[in-house]
């Protein structure tokens, strides 16, 4: 470790604000430099958000709110804004007591309980708040949300990946019922069929990304095709975990700010920006394993640590990305998948 990194390590807490233990390879010097700049941004945004939320109907969908969300929601307002813009608040208001009923019913479902219990200790082992022996431990809250959601959405039930999403929602909302309704918004409406047994939505969007790369970054597309690498091997975790455990926590939360407001199109913007930023690095790959390694490497480093700069880039770098274009590509890929499964 160089001297600058050692000095920074002495001043930056080993455990972050969300309870995650910083990894061994964590670059303290880069982080310290970023956070000094970012605190200024956070202070400015917090003042603007406080003023906005004092107004009536402040979080209605508007150009102003969209601009504010893209620039980041302060942590103290994040839970409230996510609930309103995603429609989760309205659903919760219309379904008083529903979350509790689903949990009670779910507790009678041994298959669901087995699946949920299997993954509890695997959820964020690097987070002190999710450890079984922590006091308080978020594991019980995670269990309650996953059991209730599995009972609510019987088509999906429970599948791996959902535990990480529920965990992040609990960290942000600090409320089981809100986390449940935000999961309903994400899995039921924003990302339909990502977590269904056939995972049609997930498979479709991975191939749609392939189409977008072919159009916008043809050299990368040619390299991947030449080595017979399937997109699912490179990006399935990006999509299914919504960049959790892929990108830094604060960067993921900034992405989710936009995901709840603008929908799944944001995931394509993130993926395309990463690939475009590191295009030259990816093109150095000489074989199949090389390509896979490069795609793991591009999710680390200073570019993704500076979440504010990164978010500016995702709305600039990929260029135009209309809903019409994505809908057409999705339809094409759905038909392709259906024909392959016959």
UniProtKB/Swiss-Prot annotation:
UniProt cross-references to InterPro entries, sorted A to Z: Rab-GAP-TBC_dom, Rab-GAP_TBC_sf, Rab_GAP_TBC_domain
UniProt feature coiled coil, ranges: none
Alphabetic keyword roster: GTPase activation
Gene3D superfamilies xrefs: putative rabgap domain of human tbc1 domain family member 14 like domains (1.10.8.270), Ypt/Rab-GAP domain of gyp1p, domain 1 (1.10.10.750), Ypt/Rab-GAP domain of gyp1p, domain 3 (1.10.472.80)
Limits of the Rab-GAP TBC domain: 72-263
Pfam family, any one: RabGAP-TBC
Keyword Cytoplasm belongs to the record: no
Segment forming the signal sequence: none
One of the record's GO molecular function terms: small GTPase binding
Top-level lineage group: Eukaryota
Function summary: May act as a GTPase-activating protein for Rab family protein(s).
PANTHER family according to UniProt: GROWTH HORMONE-REGULATED TBC PROTEIN 1, RAB GTPASE-ACTIVATING PROTEIN 1-LIKE
Protein name: Growth hormone-regulated TBC protein 1
Species assigned in the record: Xenopus laevis
Gene this chain is encoded by: grtp1
